[in-house]
C-alpha cells in the first residue's frame, strides 16, 4: 500500500496506520455504510450499484465482499445501524425522564426525539422511509421485524409512564408506530428540515396523532 505506515505485526497481523486487520475491516464497514447512506438517499437503492458504493467509500470491490455478501446485505446493515442510533436516542431520553413527569408531556417529548432522529439528517429519513417498502422480500421482512420491536418498545414506555394499558395494547402500539412513520414520510415530500416552522408543524401533527391513538389505551 503506497504511503501506508506499516508498524509491524501483532495478534491481528500487520498494523497499517496503527490499525490491525480487524480494525481495518471495521473501518471499511463503516465507510461502506456511510457511502450507502449517501447514495441510497440521493438516488435510491435500485439505481445504486456496488461499484458506485465502493467508489464513494474508497474501498475495492474485493474488500466489499469481505465485509458484505451483497447490496441487500449492506442495505439491511444500514437499517440496523439506523435502528441502533434511534434506539439509543430514545433510551437516553426515557432514562432522563423524572419520576413525577406528566405522562402525556413525557410521551410527546419522546415522540419529538423519535422524529428528530430521522429529520436531523434527511438522508436517514430518505433511506428509512423512501426505501423502506418492499425493496426486496427480505428487506420487507426486516422492516416488519423492526416495527414489531418498535411497538414493544412503545409498550415498555407506556409501562414506564404508568399509563393504563388494555390487553390490546400491542395492536395500538403497532398502529402508533406505523402512523408515526407514515406521517414523517408524508411530511418529507414537502417539508424542509431546515425550517423551524416546518418542523414545528410536523411535531404538532405527531402530537395530535398520539392524542388520538393513546385515547384507545384504556378501552376494553
Where are these regions (language model features)?
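C-terminal peripheral helix-coil segments that are non-catalytic and often amphipathic
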Residues: 1-15, 116, 151-159, 174, ...
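Generic hydrophobic, amphipathic alpha-helix propensity
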Residues: 24-36, 53, 78-90
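Helix-turn-helix
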Residues: 31, 39-73, 77
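Alpha-helical DNA-contacting segments of helix-turn-helix folds
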Residues: 68, 73-85, 89, 128, ...
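Hydrophobic alpha-helical connector segments
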Residues: 77, 91-120, 176, 203
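Amphipathic alpha-helical packing segments from all-alpha helical-bundle domains
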Residues: 84-87, 136-161, 170-178, 204, ...
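Amphipathic alpha-helical segments used for helix-helix packing
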Residues: 106, 117-137, 154, 182-189
Amino acid at each position: 500500500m503506497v504511503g501506508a505506515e506499516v508498524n509491524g505485526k501483532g495478534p491481528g497481523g500487520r498494523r497499517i496506520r496503527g490499525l490491525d486487520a480487524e480494525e481495518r475491516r471495521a473501518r471499511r464497514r463503516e465507510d461502506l455504510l456511510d457511502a450507502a447512506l449517501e447514495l441510497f438517499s440521493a438516488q435510491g437503492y435500485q439505481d445504486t450499484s456496488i461499484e458506485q458504493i465502493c467508489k464513494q467509500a474508497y474501498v475495492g470491490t474485493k474488500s466489499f465482499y469481505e465485509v458484505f455478501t451483497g447490496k441487500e446485505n449492506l442495505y439491511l446493515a444500514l437499517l440496523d445501524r439506523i435502528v441502533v442510533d434511534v434506539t439509543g436516542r430514545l433510551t437516553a431520553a426515557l432514562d432522563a425522564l423524572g419520576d413525577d413527569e406528566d405522562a402525556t408531556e413525557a410521551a410527546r417529548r419522546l415522540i419529538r426525539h423519535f422524529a428528530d432522529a430521522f429529520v436531523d439528517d434527511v438522508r436517514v429519513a430518505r433511506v428509512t422511509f423512501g426505501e423502506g417498502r418492499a425493496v426486496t422480500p427480505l428487506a420487507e421482512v426486516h422492516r416488519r421485524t423492526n416495527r414489531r420491536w418498535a411497538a414493544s418498545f412503545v409498550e415498555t414506555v407506556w409501562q414506564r409512564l404508568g399509563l393504563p394499558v388494555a390487553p390490546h395494547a400491542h395492536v395500538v402500539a403497532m398502529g402508533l408506530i406505523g402512523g408515526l412513520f407514515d406521517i414523517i414520510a408524508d411530511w418529507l415530500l414537502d417539508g424542509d428540515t431546515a425550517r423551524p416552522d416546518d418542523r414545528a408543524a410536523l411535531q404538532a401533527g405527531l402530537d395530535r396523532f398520539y392524542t388520538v391513538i393513546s385515547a384507545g389505551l384504556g378501552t376494553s
